[in-house]
Amino acid sequence: ASLAFTQMEAPGSPVIYGGFTSNVDMKTGAPAFGTPEMAKTTLIGGQLARRYGLPYRASNVNACNTVDTQAGYESMMALWPTIMSHCNFVKHAAGWLEGGLCASFEKVIVDVELLQMMSAFMDELSFSED
């Protein structure tokens, strides 16, 4: 709807398509990120963006309270579909903790490492004789 409103107000304005998806932990009511459901909706969002001919935005989010193994797992579950959906812009790319309530320098380092691995994964393979 915001894309339509933007075009009504300023026709031809550049826009980027994206959504915020989170399922909820039924015990606590807290948002749960880095889940299979979030990964699937990220992929679906990328497909819709391509269908509409728009650039796509996704996020590297998690709900962990500290920088630990779970934080890494949740970030990978957010980053893989972000990369696989051919995302043009990664929002909340590094440092996000506790569902966005805080950021961490340590998590920034972990996330930058993960982003570098994703970038290297996307490099073309060389089959030259060198």
List the model feature ranges, each with a label.
Residues A1-D111:
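Glycine-rich anion/phosphate-binding loop at the beta-strand->alpha-helix junction
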Residues E106-D130:
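Catalytic-core signal marking the mid-to-C-terminal active-site face
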